[in-house]
Amino acid sequence: MDQLQIKDLEMFAYHGLFPSEKELGQKFIVSAILSYDMTKAATDLDLTASVHYGELCQQWTTWFQETSEDLIETVAYKLVERTFESYPLVQEMKLELKKPWAPVHLSLDTCSVTIHRRKQRAFIALGSNMGDKQANLKQAIDKLRARGIHILKESSVLATEPWGGVEQDSFANQVVEVETWLPAQDLLETLLAIESELGRVREVHWGPRLIDLDLLFVEDQILYTDDLILPHPYIAERLFVLESLQEIAPHFIHPILKQPIRNLYDALKK
């Protein structure tokens, strides 16, 4: 992909753990590579299809100096986060933040941290069977947007019977396709935080829930940890999930089963 490179932008700020760093300040140096398609900007001379690097450098300087953080990791992360928010056309970003005056009391050229993030497509299943179910789904989607997660597509809302053997009210279910620069684990933590904010209490396994947010796919990632399994292990067993998925992404291929969603849906429906 095409790349814009910004190298060694110098800024003065008051980041650091030591009191002297927060009182006296020091020099920091930022370099970054931003990846996006430059075709429209190059052929149509359209600045809106590009990143105005002069404005971006000014924004970085403003953002960098408006707070005093203990860790350069925090500052670098915030620069990446706000750049993605301000420039939706950027698909990937690698940013290095150097701290050449780091107080280590040894001969040193610089210390630096590098944060590398790439936008990914993910699918999230939403469900609710308590209160105003459709309103709960809408609130969850609004909270995703508020966190900078771009909603690409929304399936229709389905009324479905509960899954898992616990007697309870029917569900309103939906699947959304999103674009996010958050890694899978961070995206999961975001979903759990939204559930908590909306009042979900985990008492009965597969029991009634005000809101349920399940991470189904993140691109073609296959992942198994104590906290997260990708793809979601029950996708091929849940007709309501497949029905919603095939509505918005029928040709998406399950990375383990190697079948498009529409085939999995047709097979389970039979």
From Swiss-Prot:
**Catalytic residues of the enzyme:** 99
Which reaction(s) does its UniProt entry say it catalyses? 7,8-dihydroneopterin = 6-hydroxymethyl-7,8-dihydropterin + glycolaldehyde; 6-hydroxymethyl-7,8-dihydropterin + ATP = (7,8-dihydropterin-6-yl)methyl diphosphate + AMP + H(+)
User: Which controlled-vocabulary keywords does the entry list?
Assistant: ATP-binding, Folate biosynthesis, Kinase, Lyase, Magnesium, Metal-binding, Multifunctional enzyme, Nucleotide-binding, Transferase
Which pathway does the record list?
Cofactor biosynthesis; tetrahydrofolate biosynthesis; 2-amino-4-hydroxy-6-hydroxymethyl-7,8-dihydropteridine diphosphate from 7,8-dihydroneopterin triphosphate: step 3/4; Cofactor biosynthesis; tetrahydrofolate biosynthesis; 2-amino-4-hydroxy-6-hydroxymethyl-7,8-dihydropteridine diphosphate from 7,8-dihydroneopterin triphosphate: step 4/4
The record's section on Gene3D superfamilies has: 3.30.1130.10, 7,8-Dihydro-6-hydroxymethylpterin-pyrophosphokinase HPPK (3.30.70.560)
* A GO molecular-function descriptor: dihydroneopterin aldolase activity
Keyword Endoplasmic reticulum attributed: no
Annotated Mg(2+) 2 binding lies at: 212, 214
* HPPK: annotated segments: 120-270
Give the span(s) annotated as DHNA: 1-119
Q: Does the keyword DNA repair apply?
A: no
Q: Which domain of life is it from?
A: Bacteria
**SMART domains, alphabetized:** FolB
List positions binding substrate.
21, 53, 72-73
Q: Which InterPro entries match?
A: Dihydroneopterin_aldolase (IPR006156), FolB_dom (IPR006157), GTP-CH-I_C/QueF (IPR043133), Hppk (IPR000550), Hppk_sf (IPR035907)
* The EC number(s) this enzyme carries: 4.1.2.25, 2.7.6.3
Query: Which annotated residues bind ATP?
Result: 160-163, 171-173, 192-195, 200-215, 227-233, 238-240
Please give the Pfam families that the UniProt record associates with this protein: FolB, HPPK
Binding-site residues, Mg(2+) 1: 212, 214
Instruction: Give the protein's biological function.
Output: Catalyzes two sequential steps of tetrahydrofolate biosynthesis, the conversion of 7,8-dihydroneopterin to 6-hydroxymethyl-7,8-dihydropterin diphosphate.
Which family does this protein fall into?
In the N-terminal section; belongs to the DHNA family. In the C-terminal section; belongs to the HPPK family.
**Quaternary form?**
Homooctamer.
User: NCBIfam families attached here?
Assistant: folB (TIGR00525), folB_dom (TIGR00526), folK (TIGR01498)
Q: What is this protein called?
A: Bifunctional folate synthesis protein
Q: Which gene encodes it?
A: sulD
